[in-house]
Amino acid sequence: MKHYFRTESILEKERCECCGKELISMKGRCMICRENPVLVSTDGVIPLFSYRLWNRELMFRWKSQEEREFSPIFARLLYEGLRKTGDRVLVPVPPRKGKIRKKGWDQIEELCSFLENRYGFRVLRILVRNTSNQQKKLSRTQRLESTKSAYSLCSGQLLEHALKPFSGHLPENLCLIDDVCTTGSTLESCAAILKEAGAKKVRAFTLFTVD
């Protein structure tokens, strides 16, 4: 596994400054982000690897077959990327309603727990998901539409408690954590909410991107 993922190349390849997909023959933004941008509030997505071949198989084994021994490995890979950008305050993308009850665990929360307890990152668990729809079953257009109101800030005492270590204020620089970036609509929705709440810069890190 250590030799399969070459973390030395993280952030070194030419990528789209918006969605993070690798660029081959252009600079700055990919064609999709130039012609039909989704990521407006998001200050760039950094996916570590492409969601292809064995990467797809590993994700299936981790998420669907619950092989949780991959969690510390994936957390280490995220750490390798995050330490190069200097992002220190992480916001996990929340699961759909009922997922934890059905599966018994949340993969993104587990990643963030490793990043918090093993590598010293601060984790702000302040986003909630309002729907139980599975995004993977939707088309691109449906995904973009469904995420507009799918997320929100946690409210009341939960938010107050989460922000207490930060003197009650939302940090200006935040980094979203998710497993796969497909259309970018989920990350964009979450980033927009965080900026409305006062964040100045919201980057996103994902394990994989669908390209």
Where would I find each of the regions flagged by the language model?
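Glycine-rich phosphate/pyrophosphate-handling loop used in enzymes and phosphotransfer proteins
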Residues: 1-211
